[in-house]
């Protein structure tokens, strides 16, 4: 599939979790549409690899800016946001695609497993949204797209991840109600099972994929491009009357 969706020329987009499968795909689509993309991730090596891919896949796009950041460190996030605004003069789009699961059944889940997931997935999203919103409010424009998950409905073995992603949905709806008067929209994309490299690396990948093909209304596993297309719409100027929504990209499997 080609990377094509609207015109983002002159726009600046910052994507957290930018070296991951979903974040990097969204970055490719935004860059191909003319946006100046800042890919932020805690993994410097993965960022370097992703930056090389960008040069090969979208050679005519504006220069990519990789940035190493820990989303749970408010000082680091604030510094990055301010640096982007100072150098580019604006910040139009924030996509928060960072996060990870650490699965265990409830009775076996440790405090550390709970805290680690909630800290990154929920608190990290709050910090990034808050700091981006400070810049967007000043300009009177912004598109905030958070990555939730189908798990926000509740998944067995994922009490931590499900709670964090449900929190992301609540956070997004609150932000939408607070910042709409400032020209800022906030929406969540809730992917189902998407075939990323990290999923393919699982020993049980084929079993997981077969179950998705069986249970989904659309009989296939999702692709990163499916999620990127949803992000692109919600990040676009044309989505100015859409806010506080959760867009499921799950092949019809909502819960």
Protein language model regions, located:
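C-terminal helical subdomain
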Residues: 188, 210-242, 251
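Short C-terminal tail/terminal secondary-structure segment
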Residues: 2-7, 232, 243-255
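Canonical Rossmann dinucleotide-binding motif of NAD(H)/NADP(H)-dependent dehydrogenases/reductases
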Residues: 7-38
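Short, small/polar-rich loop/turn modules that mediate ligand/substrate recognition or access, typified
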Residues: 90, 95, 180, 185, ...
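Catalytic loop of short-chain dehydrogenase/reductase
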Residues: 145-167, 172-173, 177-181
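Substrate-binding pocket helix/loop in short-chain dehydrogenase/reductase
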Residues: 105-106, 113-118, 208, 212
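Alpha-helical segment proximal to the catalytic Tyr-Lys
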Residues: 134, 177-181, 240
């Amino acid at each position: 599939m080609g990377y094509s969706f609207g015109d983002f020329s002159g726009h600046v987009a910052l994507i957290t979790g930018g070296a991951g499968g979903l974040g990097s795909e969204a970055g490719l689509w935004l860059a191909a549409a003319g946006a100046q993309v800042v890919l932020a991730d805690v993994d410097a090596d993965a960022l370097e690899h992703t930056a090389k891919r960008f040069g090969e896949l979208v050679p005519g796009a504006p220069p990519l800016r990789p940035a190493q950041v820990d989303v749970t460190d408010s000082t680091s996030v604030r510094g990055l946001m301010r640096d982007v605004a100072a150098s580019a003069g604006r910040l139009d789009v924030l996509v928060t695609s960072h996060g990870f699961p650490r699965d265990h059944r409830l009775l076996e889940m440790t405090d550390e497993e709970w805290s680690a997931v909630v800290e990154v997935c929920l608190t990290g999203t709050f910090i990034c949204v808050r700091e981006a919103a400070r810049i967007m409010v000043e300009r009177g424009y912004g598109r905030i797209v958070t990555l939730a998950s189908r798990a926000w409905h509740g998944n067995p073995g994922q009490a931590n991840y499900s709670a964090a992603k449900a929190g992301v949905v609540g956070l997004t709806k609150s932000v939408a109600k607070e910042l709409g008067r400032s020209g800022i929209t906030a929406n969540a994309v809730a992917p189902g099972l998407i075939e990323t490299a990290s999923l393919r690396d699982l020993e049980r990948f084929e079993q997981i994929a077969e179950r998705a093909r069986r249970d989904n209304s659309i009989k296939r596993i999702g692709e990163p491009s499916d999620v990127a297309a949803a992000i692109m719409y919600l990040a676009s100027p044309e989505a100015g009357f859409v806010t506080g929504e959760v867009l499921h990209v799950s092949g019809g499997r909502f819960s």
